[in-house]
Amino acid sequence: MPIVMKFGGTSVADAAAIENVARIVATERAAFPVVVVSAMSGVTDALLAATPASIAAIFSRHLATAEQLLSGSELERFAELVKSAETQVRALLQIQNPSNRKAVQDSIVSFGEILSSALTAAVLNLRGVEARQVDARRCIITDEEHTSAAPLLRESFARTEDELRPLVNGGVVPVLGGFIGATLQGVTTTLGRGGSDYTAALIGAALKVDEIQIWTDVTGVLTADPRVVPEAQTIDRLSYSEAAELAYFGAKVLHPKTIQPAIENSIAVRICNSRMPQERGTLVGPQSETSARTIKAIAHKTGVTVVQITSLRMLGAYGFLRALFEVFDRHRVVIDVVTTSEVSVSLSLDDASALPSIVEELQQLGTVGIEKGRAIICVVGDGLRGTAGIEARVFSTISDINVSLISQGASSINFTFVIDEERVKEAVTRLHEEFFTRDNAQNRAR
């Protein structure tokens, strides 16, 4: 069975990075790889902010990168593709007051992945690895919810099998852009930020691969964000549940939606470092590693807003919570943490763009309070099950920091709370010192 190899934006950021990707893929030729790539680092943001005056620089970057990697007819073909992409983006930017602004946005940003996949395929061929660019819109079929489309699994799996299986069986490496798909009518859509991981997982599930590899710029999943805790360590192995919790609550090396297709099809997911390909990274599978540690990692998420709804109507009433959550459902806003009392509900969310409309509806249910500038900290580990005293250690370690919205997941593998954003780095550093640095020293002393 084949494997899927997904390379993020930093892994295809420039000519040297793309050369490195070609070397990594070449070493896996015997495993029948399918390659998924993100747009070059920074390109998606640049396309989202594009104006007629700024887009020339975006496409010049692609051409300049190609000139370092290709020559002759290969370079000419890619240059034509870049020219066509720029022409199409300029036309899209000229649309005045589009009836579906998000659909236009999806079409514009899709060119980042289209160009990076074309360039990667061309470099692989030039380096002796037979490869072919495949338009991901022929494989990933979605609903019509632009900028955050949901895949239609039956159609996507069937199309992926039809498009990719003959290539894989013939020894050809398919190269696809992640993040993008199309409706049944062929209209371009995108899967939302981080969607390239999701693309890789969907393709892996469709082809029933042995392993999905996510190549990024860090060596696997770490015990904390290395930008906050420089001494954070790589975790050798995580269970699907642990990885899902960490991804959802801020460990950005893995998109949360990546896990579900892997779980449903019992596919291992390996997170690797494209700058250090010799390292094994982190393997995510059904079982966690056997470890003396109760806690595997500490994740955090900033930019969180807390919403509190207070109403005496909650007392002994049926249907209040349903009405409350339906408001968020209508606005397609995901809730992170929820706590309830007899007369109030507090919840956190990291997408506050629809908040004014949401608050207007919530005020029909009760008094609404808003707290911005908050952060979520999530302590994760299968060892939390049945281990007494973890919460006490956490709160003792950060006893001078105000904590709210304390929650333990139903799976009992995560413990989550909310604090002021200004103190999140301090809190994460202290907790890592308590549960990793100190515990490691104690284990060595035994």
Show the residue positions of the predicted features.
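Nucleotide/pyrophosphate-binding catalytic subdomain
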Residues: M1-L254, I259, I419-D420, D439, ...
